[in-house]
Curated annotation (Swiss-Prot):
Protein name: Proline--tRNA ligase
Listed SUPFAM superfamilies: Class II aaRS ABD-related (SSF52954), Class II aaRS and biotin synthetases (SSF55681), YbaK/ProRS associated domain (SSF55826)
Function (record text): Catalyzes the attachment of proline to tRNA(Pro) in a two-step reaction: proline is first activated by ATP to form Pro-AMP and then transferred to the acceptor end of tRNA(Pro). As ProRS can inadvertently accommodate and process non-cognate amino acids such as alanine and cysteine, to avoid such errors it has two additional distinct editing activities against alanine. One activity is designated as 'pretransfer' editing and involves the tRNA(Pro)-independent hydrolysis of activated Ala-AMP.
Protein source organism: Shewanella amazonensis (strain ATCC BAA-1098 / SB2B)
Localization: Cytoplasm
Top enzyme class: ligase
EC number in record: 6.1.1.15
Transmembrane regions: none
Quaternary context: Homodimer.
Domain notes: Consists of three domains: the N-terminal catalytic domain, the editing domain and the C-terminal anticodon-binding domain.
Xref: PROSITE patterns: AA_TRNA_LIGASE_II
Family: Belongs to the class-II aminoacyl-tRNA synthetase family. ProS type 1 subfamily.
GO biological process: prolyl-tRNA aminoacylation
Database matches in Pfam families: HGTP_anticodon, tRNA-synt_2b, tRNA_edit
Length: 572
């Protein structure tokens, strides 16, 4: 591709409204342009990368036995009513009516459509298992779209759905998708980690996320230092306490704490160790008999809201009680609540139940109890894992301790079970002629999100540093003062022809532009390999080659360049 015939659209300045590196560089490199909040057009450079990502995803899905289809982005609202998600999904689901006053949605996901399709097309167990996928635009009306295509309202996604008669075949397909996803991200040259995950609003039981590792990642990954165990922080299991509860050595006493409304203030003002304090959090209950529930975590721990949401006594989705509700039920504000004499169900994290001589609110404004002990000052309560894990704690497989890394979720696989097939009565006849509800799996890859995640992981102060497999172009040709030298023009044209015929994707900068601008654009675009041609190179018979990732420069004889570049690709 000649730059003179191409829509390059690079920018020198970093856009003021772009918060993360990928958004900044996608705008500066002329990959995308904003049309409205969370809506972007892909310019040629961005589309080339997007298509390469798509191609790898498609090849690996096909290799794993999945079959490609295409479903509509616009979906009948009736299907969402049938599964109950019309009401459950919330305002992210963009709804509208057509001229006949029929309800429709812009699809954020396609479980309803695919289940409706399969219940009409598949009737016998002999047609199963079946794994269908599409690469399609999705729409979620995010309340605050941000980070460019990382969290946009409209995005491109590969979503696959499998249908099964038995758990055994669901397990097999799930493992095949796990392997396919690992192959996808490996082929793209990305550092990634699969982790155990919560199923969220999609539902189901077993679930893994695939994260591209990046310091800017929104998700916190907890992984084992001694094994392959890894989980999203929401899913990571906290270890059970190994030490027994200590003996009571302090008497229960009430302390005036008018200026200590937080754990940090209590620790600072009264010198109590933070691990000897507890936080009491009041949430909405799941029943009329218990409209409020108290959750207890140690002062140095954080409540895991995903775990808390799954507690039987707690209303889902999790909702914290308001100040007025708390004051009406307890007689004190949020900064003075504690479990002693609290008249509501209490669930404590396992670590809280082995505490002794601890401090908590006294359920009276401006007062705390110190020296609280279980079975003396209050009865033991229900225990559960309701906290986030901490670095250095033992992992559940017993093979190491937790360490943390940040990641960007780019893939998610689920075993849905019969959640959607049962709701929509998607059945087949088994070998005995008996009707059976199908089991389902679903498997998503954020195609457009991968582009941004790859940039977050691969960039430097000069721009993007693309892995070769998804770079918009693989080789750049930079002729110095081409329009002043016929020799440079002829040599550059011949090289462009030679490299193109050899199968390289070449960006040939044939503009009448200053060398500094040409170099800056090539580095901003992140082209992995650059070849420089000037009169001096022609005199010596060697090209100047530069590797974008390492910055290393090498002089390569004219006749050896093609073989040299092929060797670089094999190494990459």
């Amino acid at each position: 591709m000649r730059v003179s015939k191409y829509l390059l659209s690079t920018q020198k300045e970093t856009p003021a409204n772009a918060e993360v590196v990928s958004h900044q560089l996608m705008l500066r490199a002329g990959m995308i342009r904003r049309n409205a909040s969370g809506l972007y057009s892909y310019l040629p450079t961005g589309l080339r990368v997007l298509r390469k990502v798509e191609a790898i995803v498609r090849e690996e899905m096909n290799k794993a036995g999945a079959i490609e289809i295409l479903m509509p982005m616009v979906q009948p609202g009736d299907l969402w009513v049938e599964t109950g998600r019309w009401d459950q999904f919330g305002p992210e689901l963009l709804r509208f009516t057509d001229r006949h006053n029929r309800d429709f949605v812009l699809g954020p996901t396609h479980e309803e459509v695919i289940t409706d399709l399969i219940r009409k097309e598949v009737s016998s167990y002999k047609q199963l298992p079946l794994n269908l996928y599409q690469i399609q635009t999705k729409f979620r009306d995010e309340v605050r779209p941000r980070f460019g295509v990382m969290r946009s309202r409209e995005f491109l996604m590969k979503d696959a759905y499998s249908f099964h008669l038995t758990q055994e075949t669901l397990d097999e397909t799930y493992q095949a998708m796990y392997t396919a996803y690992s192959n996808i991200f490996s082929r793209m040259g990305l550092a990634f980690r699969p982790v155990l995950a919560d199923t969220g609003s999609i539902g189901g039981s077993v679930s893994h996320e695939f994260h591209v590792l990046a310091q800017s990642g929104e998700d916190l990954i907890a992984y084992s230092t001694g094994s392959d165990y890894a989980a999203n922080i929401e899913k990571a299991e906290a270890p059970l306490p190994t030490e027994p509860r200590g003996e009571a050595t302090e008497a229960l006493r009430t302390v005036d704490t008018p200026n200590a409304k937080t754990i940090a203030e209590l620790v600072e003002q009264f010198g109590v160790a933070i691990e000897k304090t507890i936080k009491t959090l009041i949430v909405k209950g799941a029943t009329e008999e218990a409209p409020l529930v108290a959750l207890l975590v140690r002062g140095d721990h954080e409540l895991n809201e995903i775990k808390a949401d799954k507690l039987e006594l707690v209303a889902s989705p999790l909702e914290f009680a308001g100040e007025a509700e708390i004051r009406a039920a307890v007689g004190a504000g949020t900064g003075s609540i504690g479990p002693v004499n609290l008249k509501m169900p209490i669930i404590a994290d396992h670590s809280v139940l082995v505490m002794s001589d601890f401090a908590a609110g006294a359920n009276e404004d401006g007062k705390h109890f110190f020296g609280i002990n279980w079975e003396r000052d209050l009865p033991l309560v229900q225990g559960a894992d309701i906290r986030n894990v901490v670095e250095g704690e033992a992992t559940p497989d017993g093979k190491g301790t937790y360490a943390f890394a940040r990641g960007i979720e780019v893939g998610h696989i689920f075993q849905l079970g019969n959640k959607y097939s049962e709701a929509m009565n998607a059945t087949v006849l088994d070998e005995n002629g008996k009707s059976q509800i199908m089991l389902m799996g679903c498997y998503g890859v954020g195609v457009s999100r991968i582009v941004a995640a790859a940039i977050e992981q691969n960039n430097d102060e000069r721009g993007i540093v693309w892995p070769e497999a998804i770079a918009p172009f693989t080789v750049g040709i930079l002729p110095m003062n081409m329009h002043k030298s016929h020799r440079v023009t002829d040599t550059a044209e011949a090289l462009y022809k030679e490299l193109t015929e050899a199968g390289f994707e070449v960006l040939f900068d044939d503009r009448k532009e200053r060398p500094g601008v040409m170099f800056a654009d090539m580095e901003l675009l992140g082209i992995p390999h650059t070849v420089v041609i000037g009169d001096r190179n022609i005199d010596t018979g060697v090209y100047e080659y530069k590797n974008r990732r390492t910055g290393e420069k090498t002089e390569v004889p004219f006749a050896e360049l093609v073989s040299f570049l092929k060797a670089q690709f094999q190494q990459g």
